[in-house]
Structures are given as structure tokens and as C-alpha cells.
Curated annotation (Swiss-Prot):
GO molecular function, one term: methylenetetrahydrofolate dehydrogenase (NADP+) activity
Protein name: Bifunctional protein FolD
Biological pathway: One-carbon metabolism; tetrahydrofolate interconversion
A Pfam family that the UniProt record links to this protein: THF_DHG_CYH_C
UniProt xrefs under SUPFAM superfamilies: Aminoacid dehydrogenase-like, N-terminal domain, NAD(P)-binding Rossmann-fold domains
EC number: 1.5.1.5, 3.5.4.9
Key words of the record: Amino-acid biosynthesis, Histidine biosynthesis, Hydrolase, Methionine biosynthesis, Multifunctional enzyme, NADP, One-carbon metabolism, Oxidoreductase, Purine biosynthesis
Subunit: Homodimer.
Function per UniProt: Catalyzes the oxidation of 5,10-methylenetetrahydrofolate to 5,10-methenyltetrahydrofolate and then the hydrolysis of 5,10-methenyltetrahydrofolate to 10-formyltetrahydrofolate.
Length: 285
């Protein structure tokens, strides 16, 4: 029996609709809507697409979206000064600096300059630390979205053997903490892991985020497992495929995310959720 497809597009639309309804209630009570500032430095084509999607999502739910498109020659100091200005702006609840930044700019310093309660990407060390201490505040967007996808399966995950392939700061590491918080027994696999196959084959739940086309053979997937494929890899013919061999994995898994239309839409939906949360928890008074 083929796996049930986890429809990220549908679930993301449901999240956005929920946020939109909340914003309409806020505005009808006479309060200002939430505000998100999006900062883009340089002319990276993929970044422009991502930023456009984020701005469109903001407008759809009724946020005020402010855009700051800066040239690739922008200095570190000018970028930090802009963040300081946005930190002080009482009508801005979230600040998003689109990554990657052009060469010569210090990403860590930039991200740490954003006030933790305006860090709607969830990358600030304070927010990562809160997640590690089991008291999450603003959570990293992609792992948060993945948890929403997993919850949609209705399968209890407490006690499951969960395996994460990939240990990036954006997905793998915070994903480990999310699944640990949810009660899974979690294994983190990375480029130094020996016998990756044995880890994957025992996983009741697997999250793959390495950016390599069909890196995980479908034959490795445990029957009935939940498979979350974070990879988005463009092929020479223009098609997009994930990090898991979908055609074979789909025949073995219990649930699986497609590529595209799985994890990707949830990252933006989680950003929208975080912006509303920042407004409600930290700025609405």
C-alpha cells in the first residue's frame, strides 16, 4: 500500500488562514496589524524568489510588510544600523534577513543583532537556547513547520526512533531538539556517520536535509515510517526532486512529504506564525 502523502501546500494554507482570521480579529478591535520587515542584500536569484513568496504571504494574511532591498556592496556597519533602526521600530514585530548574505558580511553578527523577540526566523542564540532548555520561544521556521506536518499524520511520536540526516544550523540541529522535546529517541547523522544505512533502516521517523538528489535510497526506508524530505534539488531538465528516492520510498513509508509541495510551503507558513506570535506575546501592549 503506498504511503499517505503529507500535503504541505494544503496544511500551509490552513495555517495562513488561521493567522489571517486572528489578524482580522486584531484589526477589528482597533489595534494595528502585525508588521514584518524583510531585508534582502544583493541580487541572488533564489533569494529574490524566496523573499517575494514571503512578502506575498504577509500581504495575504493582513500583515504590514516593509521591504529593504540593499545592494551587494552594502557594508556590515550599514546593515547593522538598519537592524538597529528596525529593532527600535514599534510597528515592526519581526525582522527577517534573507540568507545567504554576500561575501564579506558576517552572518552571525547580523543575526545576533536582531532582538530575540523580533527574530522570527528563530536563529538567534537566545531562541535556540530556549529550545534546548525545553522552553521554546520563537522556534526555527523549517523545524517548526516539519513538526506541524508530523502532527498532521495523527501518529503519536513519543518514544519513536527518529533519525535526522544532516546537521545544519538551520534544519538538522534545531530539528534534533524539536524531536527530543516531542519525546522521540533521536539520532543525528552527518558526513562523519558510519553505516548510515543501518541508522536509516531502523528509523520510525526520518528527516533528511542534505541537499543531494535522491541521497537516501527508498529501499532503506522502514515499512510504515514517517519520511520528511527537506531537500529541493533542481535537475538539468528543470524538475525538482528531494533528498530521498521518492518512487521507491513511497511504496514502503507510512507517510511521506512530496518535493515540491511538502516542507517548502511550511517554512513560510511558520514564519507567518512566528510573526503573529511575536506580536501577541511581546509587542501588542
Amino acid at each position: 500500500m503506498p504511503a499517505q502523502k503529507i500535503d504541505g501546500k494544503l496544511i500551509a494554507q490552513q495555517v495562513r488562514q488561521h493567522v489571517k482570521s486572528h489578524v482580522e480579529s486584531i484589526v477589528s478591535s482597533g489595534k494595528r496589524p502585525p508588521g514584518l520587515a524583510v531585508v534582502l542584500v544583493g541580487s541572488d536569484a533564489a533569494s529574490h524568489v524566496y523573499v517575494t513568496n514571503k512578502r506575498r504571504a504577509c500581504e495575504e494574511v493582513g500583515f504590514v510588510s516593509k521591504s529593504y532591498d540593499l545592494p551587494s556592496t552594502t557594508s556590515q556597519q550599514k546593515l547593522l544600523e538598519l537592524i538597529d533602526t528596525l529593532n527600535a521600530d514599534e510597528e515592526i514585530d519581526g525582522i527577517l534577513v534573507q540568507l545567504p548574505l554576500p561575501a564579506g558580511l558576517d552572518k552571525e553578527q547580523v543575526l545576533e543583532r536582531i532582538l530575540p523577540h523580533k527574530d522570527v526566523d528563530g536563529f538567534h542564540p537566545y531562541n535556540i537556547g530556549r529550545l534546548a532548555q525545553r522552553i521554546p520561544a520563537l522556534r526555527p521556521c523549517t523545524p517548526k513547520g516539519i513538526m506541524t506536518l508530523i502532527e498532521s499524520t495523527k501518529r503519536p511520536i513519543k518514544g519513536l526512533d527518529a533519525v535526522i540526516v544532516g546537521a545544519s544550523n538551520i534544519v538538522g540541529r534545531p530539528m534534533f531538539m524539536e524531536l527530543l522535546l516531542a519525546g522521540c529517541t533521536v539520532t543525528s547523522c552527518h558526513k562523519f556517520t558510519k553505516d548510515l544505512q543501518s541508522h536509516v533502516e531502523r528509523a520510525d521517523l526520518i528527516v533528511v536535509a542534505v541537499g543531494i538528489s535522491a541521497f537516501i535510497p527508498g529501499e532503506w526506508i522502514k515499512p510504515g515510517a514517517i519520511v520528511i524530505d527537506v531537500g529541493i534539488n533542481r535537475q538539468t531538465d528543470g524538475t525538482l526532486i528531494g533528498d530521498v528516492d521518492y518512487a521507491t520510498a513511497e511504496k514502503r513509508a507510512g507517510w511521506i512529504t512530496p518535493v515540491p509541495g511538502g516542507v517548502g510551503p511550511m517554512t513560510v507558513a511558520s514564519l507567518i506564525e512566528n510573526t503573529l506570535e511575536a506580536y501577541v506575546k511581546y509587542h501588542s501592549n
